[in-house]
Amino acid sequence: MKNQDQALIFEVSKEGRIGYSLPKLDVEEVKLEDVFESDYIRVEDAELPEVSELDIMRHYTALSNRNHGVDSGFYPLGSCTMKYNPKINESVARFAGFANIHPLQDEKTVQGAMELMYDLQEHLIEITGMDTVTLQPAAGAHGEWTGLMLIRAYHEANGDFNRTKVIVPDSAHGTNPASATVAGFETITVKSNEHGLVDLEDLKRVVNEETAALMLTNPNTLGLFEENILEMAEIVHNAGGKLYYDGANLNAVLSQARPGDMGFDVVHLNLHKTFTGPHGGGGPGSGPVGVKADLIPYLPKPILEKTENGYHFNYDRPEAIGRVKPFYGNFGINVRAYTYIRSMGPDGLRAVTEYAVLNANYMMRRLAPFYDLPFDRHCKHEFVLSGRRQKKLGVRTLDIAKRLLDFGYHPPTIYFPLNVEECIMIEPTETESKETLDGFIDKMIQIAKEVEENPEVVQEAPHTTVIKRLDETMAARKPVLRYAKPAPVQV
């Protein structure tokens, strides 16, 4: 039943079928022509589906059964921290005092919400070792861009207009160079060494008087802790640059180490990842940015302050980069993150990291005999395998990922980071049990054996899903982005 083909909602449509009947109009009717110019008014009715309420419910329920989420199964997507989202978060986010307020209300009427925001900022300051935090950015890449704009404002305020280059490692998230470009910087790549860490000699080579910042994830995207981080910070700071922390992998160091203590000047966090805001369906996210004291003047306005008279938003920020989002950030996700932090406490957050690292190392060691391990050393919250061995037998990493679908697992991240051939990046998170990990590991081992004994099974996977293999070339070159009503059948 679950894998049956599903008609489009347009194909279910029957002319004249009604889902809802609206009550009789009890206010004066307004003609569209009196409100909009003719250029904005349709000449013909939109071709919308005409379906009943039951049709709608069955259609979208059937589609939802095809989806894979954290609540339905293991989701080892590397560098995405697809951990379980506790349902207490949802209960708190639905409190009337949080769910039914409006950002344009008088500050005096939303002091409770403002108190939560302020306390969340204080918790994030303590967790990161920064001096203050803004909650405005909507998600990770938005946080990156905001942090880079702060760095740009800092350099320009100091008359340093020639700092136009941002350094990123060859293992960096793709959003890092993209954010740097959008912020007006040129991206310079620093190489990794044979241990998977930033090559210090290459860093010294690329750092100069044009360096605005070095963007790092620590641990990096290979799941390896940059053990030379203090020396790296010194190299960048001595050259007049700033050190930027991409918080994508913060789950690996919670209550164990703080970016601020490593020498970072700016940090963005992904509350929808590390702090259990639900994600994976396109948002919303939350990407707060923390900074050291010398960058505070440039934070987006307003900033939330606490006084003896309560909480208020301070707009008197002459050096601020301006707003980066309407109002005050994605409040609902921030409520969920606050709930998670308060329910876990310092000891709970420390345990998060301990179990995340334990799970990743357990999986890595069990899978290492069957797949290549590019960096054979202790990992943090995630690890990287390579399908080079399988590729020599005619099976690609993509095929392995497709085969996992047959067993009900969401595949790991593949072909990223780019500096590992046939890359398979796995992040189990701390919320998964040993039994769950073993089940996934057993299937990965089975696939490795199938590659050796019956490679066609893997090459032609998936076998049990509704959609098999897409024509990816055609999808990229000639995408079908809207429904086209079939032409009438000629009799």
From Swiss-Prot:
It catalyses: N(6)-[(R)-lipoyl]-L-lysyl-[glycine-cleavage complex H protein] + glycine + H(+) = N(6)-[(R)-S(8)-aminomethyldihydrolipoyl]-L-lysyl-[glycine-cleavage complex H protein] + CO2. One of its GO terms (cellular component) is glycine cleavage complex. Its EC number is 1.4.4.2. The glycine cleavage system is composed of four proteins: P, T, L and H. In this organism, the P 'protein' is a heterodimer of two subunits. One of its GO terms (molecular function) is glycine binding. NCBIfam families: PRK04366.1. The glycine cleavage system catalyzes the degradation of glycine. The P protein binds the alpha-amino group of glycine through its pyridoxal phosphate cofactor; CO(2) is released and the remaining methylamine moiety is then transferred to the lipoamide cofactor of the H protein. Keywords: Oxidoreductase, Pyridoxal phosphate. The keyword Oxidoreductase applies. It holds the Pfam family GDC-P. Signal peptide: none annotated. The modification N6-(pyridoxal phosphate)lysine is found at K273. The lineage of its organism: Bacteria, Bacillati, Bacillota, Bacilli, Bacillales. PANTHER family: GLYCINE DEHYDROGENASE (DECARBOXYLATING), MITOCHONDRIAL (PTHR11773:SF1), GLYCINE DEHYDROGENASE, DECARBOXYLATING (PTHR11773). InterPro entries: GcvPB, GDC-P_C, GDC-P_N, GDC_P, PyrdxlP-dep_Trfase, PyrdxlP-dep_Trfase_major, PyrdxlP-dep_Trfase_small. CDD domains: GDC-P. Belongs to the GcvP family. C-terminal subunit subfamily. GO terms for biological process: glycine decarboxylation via glycine cleavage system. This is Probable glycine dehydrogenase (decarboxylating) subunit 2. It is an enzyme of class 1 (oxidoreductase). Its cofactor is pyridoxal 5'-phosphate. It comes from the Bacteria.
